[in-house]
Amino acid sequence: MASFPLRVNEKEIVRSRTIGELLAPVAPFDKKCGRENWTVAFAPDGSYFAWSQGHRTVKLVPWSQCLKNFLLHGTKNITNSSSLRLSRQNSDGGQKNKPREHIIDCGDIVWSLAFGSSVPEKQSRCVNIEWHRFRFGQDQLLLATGLNNGRIKIWDVYTGKLLLNLVDHTEVVRDLTFAPDGSLILVSASRDKSLRVWDLKDDGNMMKVLRGHQNWVYSCAFSPDSSMLCSVGASKAVVAAILV
């Protein structure tokens, strides 16, 4: 699994040098799951980077601080973990109004990650509902984690707090993707042969279930205008769905 910030033009990417490594802790935490490092993701604006460290944990890293740390140390002794491993403590020293690192315990093996950012003028599809538990501001940044037990947990990136627990899949959540239009529509792909569409602006209510795959669903992606969703799975077929 690889991830680029949205502003990066993949066609312009040339052979690049390594600037650093993020290393998972060696010792297990309280005998939790193993050291699986299966997924990474950038926030849409490049402000944060998330990666699954194993042991059921995800690390949220302010990318500008992380990159500064790498450039400060340079590329020498790249295999020396002591020089490039990020601290497990909050990197801002407790100062307010600065991006902070967070270690999130997701409660199960993490298979998928996705960032979502809010655009206030994008209203919930459920227009008749006047009251919502959550009202996301313009600067809202969320992280969705897909777990081995079929659950999806939604976290506030800035505080590291759990906001929503989406429960409907019966198997591993293999992939997650947010609509790129800022509507906070989330789609999940699962081994239960289905995709589910969630409206986070409607407190995470599930809008619809998409079926058509005969086997596990591995990955899904929105079109740039958020009107179409494509998915692939073990059945060796691409399934396209129009969401508008």
Language-model segments: what does each one mean?
Residues 58-63, 152-155, 176, 195-199, ...:
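WD40-repeat beta-propellers
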Residues 57, 151, 170, 193-196, ...:
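A conserved positional marker within WD40/Gbeta-like beta-propeller blades
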Residues 36, 45, 100, 109, ...:
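WD40/WD-repeat beta-propeller blade-loop signature
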Residues 41-46, 114-120, 134-140, 177-183, ...:
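Loop/turn segments within WD40 beta-propeller blades
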Residues 29-37, 75-78, 104-110, 167-173, ...:
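WD40/WD-repeat beta-propeller blade N-cap
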Residues 52-55, 146-149, 188-192, 232-235:
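Conserved strand-to-loop turn within each blade of WD40 beta-propeller repeats
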Residues 1-39, 65-99, 120-133:
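Intrinsically disordered, low-complexity acidic/Ser/Thr/Pro-rich linker and tail segments
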Residues 49, 143, 185-186, 229:
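Hydrophobic beta-strand positions that form the internal "hydrophobic ladder"
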